Amino acid sequence: MAVLCAGAGFCCACMDYGPLHEEPFAQSQRGVFITCEGNFGWDNASLSFYDPAARTVENEIFIRANGMKLGDVAQSMTLHKGRGYVVVNNSGAVYVIDPATFRVTGVIEGVVSPRNIHFPNDTTAYITDLYLSLIHI
């Protein structure tokens, strides 16, 4: 009986946003982005935002701001020139987001298994790949 009760409590604690829909957010000022890679193969990566001034955390901001899942294995995130680049490894994509609204402004596709993105200057980006012995430029 105790196992059943504990299991029921665990299921109730899960985040459930129902059908995918978009939510508006107040413009963020300063804070910390937190990527959670999720479970490999489960398509449950997430992105959260911590506001240290307000001492609040907004979880699942990607799905809530865009009405779509982030994907499978959020590997890393980099901020560059007013944009956020979220590298989603097993989905083979790099999402470009507006860091103030968390909304997607673009996507970089055509990479097999991206890991990290680095900007050596304002016009070049390097994307490492887990399975290929090359760096995308």
Model-derived features: where do they sit?
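Bacterial Sec-dependent N-terminal signal peptides
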Residues: 1, 6-32
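Beta-rich, blade/repeat-based domains predominating
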Residues: 67-80, 111-125
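Conserved small/polar residues in nucleotide/adenosyl-binding loops
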Residues: 135-137
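Conserved beta-strand positions in repeat-built beta-propeller and related beta-rich domains
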Residues: 34-42, 79, 84-90, 126-131
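Short loop/turn segments that connect beta-strands within beta-propeller blades
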Residues: 52-53, 98-102
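A short beta-strand motif characteristic of beta-propeller blades
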Residues: 56-69, 103-108
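An edge-strand/N-cap motif at the start of beta-rich repeat modules
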Residues: 23-52
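Active-site-adjacent structural elements in enzyme catalytic domains
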Residues: 93, 99, 112
